[in-house]
Amino acid sequence: VSPFVLAASAEMLFTDLPLTERVRRLDAAGLEVEIWDWTTKDLPALAATGARFGSMTGYVRGGLVDPGAADELLRTAERSLAAAEVLGCPRLNVHGTGLDARGLPVVPHEVVTAADLLAAARTLERLAALGERHGRVFTLENLNRAVDHPGVPFARAEETLALVAAVDSPHLRLNLDLYHAQIGEGNLVELCLAALPHVGEIQVADVPGRCEPGTGEIHYPRVAAALAGAGYSGVVALEGWAAGDPATALERFREAFTPAVPVGAPGAAP
């Protein structure tokens, strides 16, 4: 049995099926379900599946720095909270700026200044207050610039962690995406341990290719053992494609995050 709450993205698995059927498949596998843009979805139909939804995109447009963009992010976050209510979804995910359908920033922001960081922290304080009023948690996700999201501000986990720690609210947590972090930063075990006090969930996929654990260079069983050894029992979500059969991908994911011996326990490797 995994010590973590396991989840998976319905956006990236069983993609030959309608979304409601993907959700049912993940739920039948005992997983929390995650989705992205809720505005294109039949929310009552998704709710009717009876699945446990864990995370969804928490804004439609906007950004963290420019005052007008920040106001738009807050306005669309309020709409997203209403959607989360329909699904009973506890976590709403945001990024450093609004992304288009290709994952590219609507307004590229290549250089982040100290003033930008301060402005972003103020916006995130407002977002945390909104989450508190509605009894929900917003998560801020790190991305990567090299492969998937060039031009996105606050892409590094180092930056997103600093922002979440500065706001220091139970209603704003870090969505630590280890696929993105491996591309941009590496040193995943130390990153996880440093971030754990502020983590709302951890997302995973292997590098390169963004498929399930075991298809790339990351030794996820070692990461899982470190997390378990540190006492983490929260959400770990597969946000990646299946290299082949999706059911097999889910089994590989589950196996990687069911560590036999936590790091630091008797019999663990040094």
Identify the function of each model-found stretch.
Residues 6, 33, 53, 138, ...:
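Hydrophobic anchor at the start of a short beta-strand
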